[in-house]
């Protein structure tokens, strides 16, 4: 009899956790559907509780009368030991893609429990609209969202795109192996996702082409935070681009290329808010400031360094930028000969550095000065 008690207890515990997980999954689903969002509305909520599995669904409709409607179907696993809490699919809201998508499904998703968090993995279907007029292609698109289990707020988001190719006639955009991730200082709601939030953001890709302008690889890290008693938004941006080629053959009969570009920038503005009607970001005082800590352009084993500051507002524009190089600008940029040479805008200091010191002030009588000398009186407003 004692031997029979052990399997009975195990069986009862298994049944108990099934009922418990069924209750947890139902609570999670209804908490998810109660989420308020200014961009879409959740309708037609259904939950069908089962023993080992529960099924649920709801529809999402946009609030801008665009006719975008998508249905989310869930299959919950009422077993604590299942790898995934739920799996499901997202129907396609764009009618023009119906013929290109298997079962008219835009994406599939899986929800997995990770300690106190939930990881939502969304795999999108590949889309290929290529025809005689051009290409419209995206492949291997994946998004993962890390949610706080308690209030379903976003702690981090990660996206990956294997390939994007849009080309029509003479216009072309191609991107390969894009990775983007953002970790938030504090968990945020879905409705705040497009706002400025304190976070660390990383962005990289292997190759990009825009109308014959190419970059072989790119990496960027942004630290976004608020300063001055939470009233000023700042973004510290650092990164590099390799093998940049700008096709200017139609303008100066050749391309401008750099082996590498390193940058260190700080962008700041007064904390933006959202207008009540359009939900669009607006700087509160329309003042923007860009500090160029350093930009280094590398070409043929030579460095061109750029530092300075740019200030923009509705009332005035100001800029102070210094460009320096050990090598003569005309030797680095041979295309300058078409404009009388670039050396004329530089002075050579005692250390042998070629320097351009540029000042611009929209309020001054002489708006633009190069190396202290008046350049022109044109108005750049």
Where are these regions (language model features)?
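Hydrophobic membrane-insertion alpha-helices, especially the h-region
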Residues: 2-18
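Glycine-rich, small/hydroxylated-residue low-complexity segments
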Residues: 13-15, 19-381
């Amino acid at each position: 009899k004692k031997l029979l008690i052990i399997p009975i207890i195990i069986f009862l515990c298994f049944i108990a956790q099934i009922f418990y997980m069924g209750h947890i999954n139902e609570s999670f689903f209804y908490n998810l559907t109660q989420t308020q969002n200014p961009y879409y509305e959740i309708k037609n909520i259904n939950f069908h509780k089962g023993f080992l599995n529960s099924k649920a669904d709801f529809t999402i409709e946009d609030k801008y009368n665009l006719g975008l409607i998508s249905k989310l179907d869930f299959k919950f696993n009422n077993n604590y030991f299942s790898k995934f809490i739920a799996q499901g699919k997202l129907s396609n809201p764009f009618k023009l893609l119906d013929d290109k998508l298997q079962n008219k499904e835009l994406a599939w998703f899986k929800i997995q429990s990770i300690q106190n968090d939930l990881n939502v993995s969304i795999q999108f279907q590949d889309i290929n609209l290529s025809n005689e007029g051009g290409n419209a292609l995206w492949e291997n698109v994946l998004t993962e969202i890390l949610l706080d289990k308690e209030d379903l707020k976003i702690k981090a988001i990660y996206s990956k795109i294997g390939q994007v190719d849009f080309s029509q006639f003479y216009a072309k955009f191609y991107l390969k192996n894009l990775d983007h991730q953002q970790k938030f200082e504090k968990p945020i709601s879905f409705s705040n996702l497009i706002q400025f939030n304190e976070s660390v953001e990383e962005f990289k890709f292997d190759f990009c082409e825009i109308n014959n302008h190419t970059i072989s690889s790119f990496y960027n890290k942004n630290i976004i935070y608020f300063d001055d008693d939470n009233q000023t938004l700042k973004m510290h941006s650092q990164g590099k681009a390799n093998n940049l080629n700008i096709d200017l053959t139609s303008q100066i009969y050749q391309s401008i290329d750099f082996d590498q570009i390193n940058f260190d920038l700080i962008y700041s503005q007064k904390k933006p808010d959202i207008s009540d009607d359009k939900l669009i970001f607006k700087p509160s005082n329309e003042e923007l400031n860009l500090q160029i800590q350093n930009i280094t352009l590398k070409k043929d084993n030579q460095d061109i360094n750029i530092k300075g500051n740019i200030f923009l507002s509705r009332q005035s524009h100001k800029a102070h930028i210094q460009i320096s190089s050990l090598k003569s600008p005309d030797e680095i940029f041979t295309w300058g000969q078409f404009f009388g040479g670039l050396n004329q805008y530089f002075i050579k200091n005692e250390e042998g550095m070629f320097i351009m010191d540029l000042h611009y002030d929209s309020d001054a009588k002489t708006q633009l000065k190069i190396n202290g000398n008046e350049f022109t009186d044109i108005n750049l407003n």
